[in-house]
């Protein structure tokens, strides 16, 4: 049952993102960020989750620090040309949880429920990414390259020894942030495409985990799944998130690979590709542990709403396969 208060705060959260998206000045964009922050704190807070107070306090302190850096850098525009851009860029990286200022992101994710994790991994990244795309200069490009490389390495290596699914998804989000930062370097439409696909795939995994109430690696044993079909959809979703062809998650990565190759950014591309292979390894570790255990001999029927959700997730991940088939059919 949805809480009416949380629904109201969710709409104001979306409003804050839209204000940042449509703003014509840094001050208005900052106001949108603050409205977004103040709306998300009540959504995190829950009397049914003992860790929500800690997560909301951590999130508030980090976001307040990022906002303070943005405000303090404003007077520097009168004295310096490049320093304010660097400070704003660093503050935005802090707000979105990109490396090397990612330290808060996994612990905050761990203290949330799955629906709140979806918002943190997707909607909460839109406004900082938009503002980051406006800070174009040679110095900020160097910082974005460093943040992208650090996010790819930390997001891939740190996820290897995790046993909590939410932490695995958190480090996966940090790794995907590296690809989005590279896409920002290319053009605005590229990172929006990547972000849209990432949001669809990561949200589908979080919805499956929420429907099965899975939070720990050990819970992925097959008796936690109501039907064997959910196991296969979970496998496909994780492989799609890892960017394995022919699933949906491969398309934006392929576009970024092509553009980085055309721009002769081979070092950047090599770091991203190696990290993508490492993340794919721990996705496979999660999914293989799910598939290798036998299913229970219990007859379980899913409600029609769950069947619709699972069918939608399956179609989304297999969408790239349908494109050439439809083109062949209509030509």
Which residues are covered by each model-predicted region?
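Core, highly hydrophobic multi-pass alpha-helical transmembrane subunits of bioenergetic inner membranes
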Residues: 1-331
């Amino acid at each position: 049952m949805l809480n009416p208060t949380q629904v109201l705060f969710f709409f104001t959260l979306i409003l804050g993102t839209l204000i940042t998206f449509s703003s014509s000045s840094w001050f208005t964009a900052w106001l949108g960020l603050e409205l977004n922050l103040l709306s998300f704190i009540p959504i995190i807070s829950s009397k049914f989750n003992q860790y929500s107070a800690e997560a909301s306090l951590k999130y508030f302190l980090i976001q307040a620090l990022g906002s303070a850096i943005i405000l303090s850098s404003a007077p520097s525009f009168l004295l310096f040309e490049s320093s304010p851009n660097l400070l704003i860029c660093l503050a935005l990286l802090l707000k979105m949880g990109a490396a090397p200022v990612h330290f808060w992101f996994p612990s905050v994710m761990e203290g949330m429920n799955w629906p709140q994790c979806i918002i943190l991994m997707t909607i909460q990244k839109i406004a900082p990414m938009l503002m980051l795309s406006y800070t174009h200069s040679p110095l900020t490009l160097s910082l974005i390259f460093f943040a992208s490389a650090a996010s790819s390495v930390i997001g891939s290596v740190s996820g290897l020894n995790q046993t909590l699914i939410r932490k695995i998804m958190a480090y996966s989000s940090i790794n995907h942030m590296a690809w989005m930062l590279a896409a920002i370097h290319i053009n605005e439409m590229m990172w929006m495409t990547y972000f849209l696909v990432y949001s669809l795939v990561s949200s589908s995994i979080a919805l499956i985990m929420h429907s099965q109430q899975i939070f720990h690696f050990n819970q992925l044993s097959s008796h936690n799944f109501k039907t064997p079909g959910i196991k296969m959809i979970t496998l496909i979703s994780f492989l799609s998130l890892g960017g394995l062809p022919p699933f949906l998650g491969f398309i934006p990565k392929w576009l970024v690979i092509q553009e980085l190759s055309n721009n002769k950014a081979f070092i950047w591309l090599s770091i991203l590709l190696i990290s993508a292979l490492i993340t794919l390894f721990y996705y496979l570790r999660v999914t293989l542990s799910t598939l290798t255990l036998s299913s229970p001999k219990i007859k379980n029927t899913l409600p029609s709403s769950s069947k619709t959700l699972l069918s939608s997730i399956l179609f989304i991940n297999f969408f790239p396969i349908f494109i050439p088939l439809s083109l062949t059919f209509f030509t």
